[in-house]
Every structure is written in C-alpha cells, then in structure tokens.
A protein has these predicted regions:
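Non-cytosolic coordination micro-motifs
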Residues: 1-52, 79-179
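Hydrophobic/aromatic-rich structural module bridging two neighboring secondary-structure elements via a short loop
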Residues: 50-73
Length: 179
C-alpha cells in the first residue's frame, strides 16, 4: 500500500505549503499516478473565493479515490487538507500514526504530548475540531462518538429517534415512469 507522509509546516506527500495552484495541481497529478488504477481519469479541480478576503482562495481537488482541500493566501498554498477517502488505497501518516485508521482519541492523546490543543468542545473526547498550533495540524470530523456516550440516557434517547428515522429507508423514495 502506498504511504503518504504528512510533514508539519511542510506539506502532505508531494503537496507543499507555499506552492502556487499550478505547482500544486502538477504535484497532485504526479501523486495520483501512485495511488490510482485509472490515472487517466480526470481529476476535478476548482478554485473559488469563499470569503470577503480577496487574498484567500479555496481549491478543491477530487477524483474517485481522493479529496484535497487547499487554502491559498496571496496565490500560495497556506493550508493543505486531505480527506479520509484516500486511506482506502494509501496509508496517510503523521508522526508514524495512520491518521485515518487510528482512533481519534489515540491520535489526540499522542499529539497532545507534542503540543497544546485547542478544541471546539470542553470534553476533548467529544470534539469535532482540534487545532495544534505549534505543529501546524488541524483535525476535523463531522460528528464525534465515544463509547461513553452509550451510558448517557439523553444520548441514547436521541439515537433511538435517529434509528426510527432510518427505518424509512426500507422503502423506495421515488418511482419514475420512462417512455
């Protein structure tokens, strides 16, 4: 399995902080050859302004195997993010840890030995965003889960409502007539 190394303050694999969008796109296409069985498949690339700051541009790069999110400041990559999908075909490592196949709690504990963390929740086990400023790494997950939640009656009541909602997917949601 291909290995992609995350280097704090440097980059992810061949994608380096400080690259222009053209340089980064070329490096990404080179990296893609290493993980993709269909390297001829087009990679979708788009850059757009998402804030009022004219110096900040967001780049999105995706194909069937991967999704990268890049923030450009003044034309240079200031942040490079890699999404979990690529972990199906490559091992993505930071400080030797497989970042998408290691429990979040273990990763957070390990990184806290190197740096202080800023978390969006008081309970670190239930946060969704973690920022380690000294090592220059941000971690994100859509929702948090920890086994201790299964002991919380309020959580279990909410989850029961979610499960009941899921039952609707036993039935079709659309029927189409074609001529």
């Amino acid at each position: 399995m291909k290995e992609i190394i995350i280097e704090p303050h440097i980059g992810i694999g061949q994608l380096k902080l400080g690259m222009t969008s053209d340089e980064l796109e070329n490096a990404l296409l080179q990296m893609k050859k290493q993980w993709s069985n269909s390297s001829d498949e087009a990679m979708q690339m788009e850059c757009c302004a998402e804030t009022d700051d004219p110096n900040l541009i967001t780049g999105r790069y995706m194909d069937n195997d991967s999704f990268f999110l890049v923030q450009y400041r003044n034309g240079k990559a200031a942040e490079i993010g890699i999404q979990r999908d690529l972990s199906k075909v490559a091992s993505i490592k930071l400080f030797g840890m497989d970042m998408f196949n290691t429990a979040a709690e273990c990763i957070i504990d390990s990184l806290m030995k190197k740096d202080n963390v800023i978390c969006n929740e008081k309970d670190l086990q239930l946060g969704t965003e973690y920022f380690f400023s000294e090592i220059g790494v941000r971690l994100w997950r859509e929702r948090a889960f920890h086994p201790k939640l299964l002991k919380d009656p309020v959580y279990m009541e909410e989850m029961q409502a979610v499960l009941e909602d899921e039952y609707q997917y036993q039935y079709f949601q659309m029927v189409t007539v074609m001529g």
